[in-house]
Amino acid sequence: MANRLCTLLLIGLVAFPLHAKEIKPVYMLSSSTPLDNPHDLKLSPNGRYLFVADVGNNRVAILDPDSLAMIASFGSDHQSGTHDIDFDAVGRAYVADTHNNRVTIYDIDDSKARLVGELNERIRGPEGVLLHSNGRVYVAGAWSGNVVAYQDGRVVAELTGLSSPHDLEETADGDIWLSDSGNHRLLLLSPQLRIKAELGRRQYNFNGVRYLDLLDDGTLVAGDKNNHVIKFIAPDGKMLLVLGSGKPGKGANQFVTPEGVEVRGNILWLSDSGNDRIVKYRLD
């Protein structure tokens, strides 16, 4: 079975080079902004702001991506257990409003947000949201154990039988990586939500793997929450790097239950959730 999964992985990722270059994360700084269990995070489309799902404060915190200073926030008057955020092609923000069993939709004007809609059909406890280049919205229902695809506000596809699914990230060729957290694995899905490949606990020692992002060469960066590390996995399935000691700690290259991951160019932002901070790295 393991060999079959490895073969599927390679078939699913042939668009990328088979050997990624060596990665050297260089610690830059940590936030001092008062956050409470921050989860996933996303740069605004123009790169000006870093939007952080601030779970314990029931809001989205907006930080300066360079200094990690707080600029603004929104949602604390109506969100509950905010877990994830993504943007569509025209800059609207979609937020996983987890404890309210919905994804809230906002028009964004600079650092101001206006609630304009929501998605809630067939999902409970959404913790991941992806705005795909095909125009669909993919939502991971952590409590409902499913992934739902919406088009024009209607459900058009669904994958069930999952365990606390979390993040969804689009690959260069339009496939989707999903963290099936309760099953301690990553799944590669087609846009129609068919499973194409699996990276499992046996091969990668995942323990509650959570949020993800992709480097330009297709390398996966994954927050392996309960192992207190960040894992870098090459397109050919090779483990390139484990960042962190594997024990809870605070400081450079130390984490407590890290979750959120965002990459832009050679800059990496991480949500060190158990330490209530955002950490910034340069990838050399």
Model-derived features with residue positions:
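Short loop/turn segments that connect beta-strands within beta-propeller blades
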Residues: 64-68, 107-111, 150-154, 190-194, ...
